[in-house]
């Protein structure tokens, strides 16, 4: 069961509470333009499910039928504990390679484009992650974890990650050693040199400690949020596609046929030498970083807000209809 649909009202309430708290203590972490952009991308990521075909789902079915170990008992507690741990392990490697390989970063980058850090950032999700992300969860089906368990623990993992996107909670003592927290996840969203590409866990931070990717948040190094190549746009289509466009452009322009292919499997940040020389990209110094914050006229903001609310209501209607249909079929 996908529990994210049921969590949406809690998400909205929590965002309003965080906003009110920030205003009350004179430490507001919200900007209308940035928050709207994050929420719009979140809506698109959910709407995408209605218009795409799941290649991954078909592969999972084939694995379950022909290649997996005997299915585990979905009513046994051990199945759920194993699934929760294994899901986060698979997520760690998807997340890590999502930063280290350009083709995967192209899908994940949308989540990191926000230059603020608040609960709307948690909802800033990709709409293209389904293209390759499913590959990393194949081990769960190979060991015989039932599909309904995988989907449920996946939604629990995602819901857990919501609350860690806040600047208002400090370090949490012993909890920091085992689980992902606001402090160690703030590090993950930073573009500071010392923090870059660290803390990939979704539920457990233990993977980062085990595989050498952990970095503690330091008082002397305030976090600078965002990406090294700022988007400088509120256009959601550009937010979702700009890395793909950059890869295609570099592949087209380079004269070396090997580099034309290498672009698509390279480490994040790599570019063909001839293209990098003829079309260098702006280098960002986090120490002097200035947030993208153009003034948006009031009427435009109101119209955009109206569109967002309408989209959320329509999406909620479609998801409820989908749930009702599924329950009807089950009966």
Where do the language-model regions lie?
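Core segments of transmembrane alpha-helices
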Residues: 51-56, 128-136, 303-314
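Substrate-recognition/cap regions that form aromatic- and gly/pro-loop-enriched pockets
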Residues: 291-331
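Membrane-embedded catalytic scaffold of the fatty acid hydroxylase/desaturase
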Residues: 43-52, 74-230
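A membrane-cytosol interface segment of integral membrane proteins
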Residues: 222-270
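Hydrophobic transmembrane alpha-helical segments in integral membrane proteins
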Residues: 1-12
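Membrane interfacial helix-start motif at the N-side
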Residues: 42-43, 117-127, 283-303
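Membrane-interface helix-loop junction between the first two transmembrane segments
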Residues: 16-37
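Juxtamembrane/interfacial segments at transmembrane-helix boundaries in multi-pass membrane proteins
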Residues: 58-81
